[in-house]
Curated annotation (Swiss-Prot):
It is an enzyme of class 4 (lyase). Keywords: Isoprene biosynthesis, Lyase, Metal-binding. It catalyses: 4-CDP-2-C-methyl-D-erythritol 2-phosphate = 2-C-methyl-D-erythritol 2,4-cyclic diphosphate + CMP. Pfam families: YgbB (PF02542). A divalent metal cation binds at D9, H11, H43. Gene3D superfamilies: 2-C-methyl-D-erythritol 2,4-cyclodiphosphate synthase (3.30.1330.50). Its EC number is 4.6.1.12. 4-CDP-2-C-methyl-D-erythritol 2-phosphate binds at residues 9-11, 35-36, 57-59, 62-66, 133-136, 140, 143. This is 2-C-methyl-D-erythritol 2,4-cyclodiphosphate synthase.
Length: 157
C-alpha cells in the first residue's frame, strides 16, 4: 500500500528568536515565533508524514498547551513521528518540500537541512528534497512578516 500526505505550516518572523529551519540555525536578525523552536519546514514534514499514515497532525501529537513541548527541538519531534509511523507498519519512501521565504536566502543551507531531516527519519539524503522560493514581494511572506513551508511525504506499507 502506498499513501501520500501533505503538510503546510507558517510562522511569524519576530525579533529576539533564533531562525531554525530544517534543524539548521540560520544567521538572521529575526526568528520564527512559536511554542516549540518554530521550525516551519520540519513542522510541515511532520504533518505530511502523519497525514499519509492517517495519524492526525502535529497539534494533536504535540499540543502547544503542553509545557513539555515549550522550545522543543522540532527535529527531535520528527524522530518521534518517524518511530510512531514505523510502529504502524509504514516506511517513508520520500519527502519533497518547498520553503516560502523572501529572506534569508536558503540555498546555502539546503544541503545541511536535507542531511538533518534524512538522518532523523533514517533515510538516504536522496530521499529528501528541499526547494526554496520567494513570494515575489506579495503577501505576508513577501513582506518579510513570516516564512512558510509545504511538504509531501510518500509512505509505503
Amino acid at each position: 500500500m502506498i499513501r501520500i500526505g501533505q503538510g503546510f505550516d507558517v510562522h511569524q518572523l519576530v525579533p529576539q528568536r533564533p531562525l531554525i529551519i530544517g534543524g539548521v540555525t540560520l544567521p538572521y536578525e529575526k526568528g520564527l515565533l512559536g511554542h516549540s523552536d518554530a521550525d516551519v519546514l520540519t513542522h510541515a514534514i511532520i504533518d505530511a508524514i502523519l497525514g499519509a499514515a492517517g495519524l492526525g497532525d502535529i497539534g494533536q501529537l504535540f499540543p502547544e498547551t503542553d509545557p513539555q513541548f515549550k522550545n522543543a527541538n522540532s527535529v527531535n519531534l520528527l524522530k518521534k513521528v518517524n518511530e510512531k509511523v514505523g510502529r504502524s507498519g509504514f516506511t517513508i519512501g520520500n519527502i519533497d518540500c518547498t520553503i516560502l521565504a523572501e529572506e534569508p536566502k536558503m540555498s546555502p543551507y539546503l544541503a545541511e537541512m536535507k542531511k538533518n531531516l534524512a538522518a532523523s527519519c533514517h533515510l538516504a539524503v536522496t530521499q529528501v528534497n528541499i526547494k526554496a522560493t520567494t513570494m515575489e514581494t506579495m503577501g505576508f511572506v513577501g513582506k518579510k512578516e513570516g516564512i512558510g513551508a509545504i511538504a509531501v511525504a510518500l509512505l509505503e506499507k
